Amino acid sequence: MITDIKKRALHRARILEGQLRGVEKMIDDEAYCVDIITQTLAIQKSLRSLNKLLVENHLRTHVTEMFDEGGSRRDDALDELLTVFELENRA
């Protein structure tokens, strides 16, 4: 994994961990539902941010290598890109 992206992804994952603990506490404390929903929507945004970093890393490393190899590896890279695109559109 690219060092800078890894650092940013770990930072984002740690933020998410804290946000999830916060939601758990809010539920346990029976916080106002809209406040909990607001926090869960923030978590979804954070997850999208993490996913963007992971996709960027994959494109800059694995996909680039697969394209450079050519042939069936290039086709595999395209298949992976389509899969990621489809997964993103389902979310």
Language-model regions: role of each:
Residues 1-91:
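Solvent-exposed interaction patches of small proteins and small membrane subunits
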